[in-house]
Amino acid sequence: KVMPQVPKYVDRKRPASMYKKDGTLSTAGQRWYDLCASHGYDYTKHEESIKVIAKWVDPNPTSMVQIKAWLTDLEWKPDTYDTNPKGDRIPLVKLKDGTLSKSVEAMITKHPYLEELATMTVVKSRISVVNNLLKAADAKGFVTAQVHGFTNTLRFRHRVCVNIPSPRKPYGKEIRALFTVRKPDHVLCGSDMSSLEDRTKQHYMWGYDPEYVKEMMTEDFDPHLDLALSAGAVTPEQVAEYKAGNHTPEVTQVRHNYKGGNYACTYGAGVLTLSRQLGITESEASKIHRAYWSRNWSVKSIAEDAIIKSVKNIKKEDNTWLYNPVSKLYYYLKADKDRFSTLNQGTGVFCFDVWIAGILRKRPQLTAQFHDEIILECKQGTEQEVTNLLKESVHEVNKKLKLNRELDCDIQFGKDYSNIH
C-alpha cells in the first residue's frame, strides 16, 4: 500500500504507413512524429522502436528491483554489499538470514512503514526453510541430516538440514523447535566442542605467542569480547558486567559481531567480506579487522611456516598440499592464502572425528551431526550417564593428541533443538 505504483512499458514501432496519399502525415505518422520529438529523435530517420509507459500498475512487494528503486527515492544510503561474478558491488537490502541491513533499518525512524519490509523478508525466508524441510520429510515426519560430500579439510558438506536460523533471529527458535523427541519420556542432548577452532588455533600459536595463549586459557577469558575491547567497541565495565551475567542487548550484539569477525579474520576475510557476512558497515568491519590482526599477528607466521608439498596430478598439473602435524595427513591447498584455514580447520575436523569415534565405540548411535555439534536422543533420567560419556570421550582425545590447548565440550538437554543449541 505504501510502495509507489510502477510503470508498465510497451514498445512503439515506426508505423508502416507514415503518410497519406497527399503526402501529409497519417494519424499513425503524427503519433510517431510526436513520440520522436519527445525523445529528441528525427522522425524521418529513426527506425528503432521506442519504449513508452502504457500505464501505471500496483507494485510487486517481492521484487527486489522495485524495492531498491523505492528505497533510492527515499534517499537510501547502502552500507552493506555483495559482489556478483563480474566483480560489481551490489547493495543489499536484506542479509542472508532474511533480516534488513542496518542502512535500511536506520530509515525506519523517518519512514515507519519500512518496518513491514523486515517482516516480509524474514517471513519469506523462513517459509522457504520450512517448506524445504516438509519436502524432505518421510511419511512419519522424519528428516535425515544428509551429507553430500566433503570439503578439502574433510568436513562434511551438509544437505536437507541446512540454513536453520539462529534462535537469536526472528522465528529461529520456532523453526528449531520442529526438531524434537520421538517419545514423551525422551530428551535430546546437544553437545559441541567448546570453541573448537579457537582452541586448535591456540595450539599452533603456543610456539609463537605463548603469553597471549596463556591469557586466552584463563577461566573467564572471552575471545570475542577481548577483541571488541581492544577495538574500543565495549568498555572494561561492560565486559565485566557481561561476564557477571548481565547480557544487555547492546553488548550481546557487539559480541556476536566480533565472534563472527574472529572466525572470519582467522581464515583471511577482508573488510568487504566482513561487512557482507556480518551485515555491518565497512567502517565497523575495518575496526574488527584491525583489532584482530593486532592481537593475532602470529597466525601469519604459522601460515608461513606450514609444510607445503607440490605434486603433479594425472593431467601433469601441479597440485599443492599442506601437511597437518596433528592428523598427519596432507590436505589439498586451494590457494596460498588458505594455508592457515586449511591447517586449522583440518585440525578441528580431525579432533572432532576422534571425539565422535570414542563416543561411538561406547554408544553406537548418533541422532544428528552438524559441523562441530552432535545430537543424541536418550531417556529422561540418563542425562548424567550421557554427560559422563561425552566428557570422558573428550578427555580421551586430550590424552591421545596431547595438544598445547586442552579440548572440552558443552552439553545441553531439552525436548527440542531450540532448547539445546
Give, region by region, the residue ranges found by the protein language model:
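Helix-rich, typically C-terminal accessory recognition domains appended to large enzymatic cores
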Residues: 269, 273-274, 353, 409
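Polymerase palm active-site segment centered on the conserved acidic dipeptide of motif C
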Residues: 1-20, 290-307, 381-421
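Acidic, glycine-rich two-metal-ion catalytic cores of nucleic acid-processing enzymes
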Residues: 2-247, 305-373, 388-396
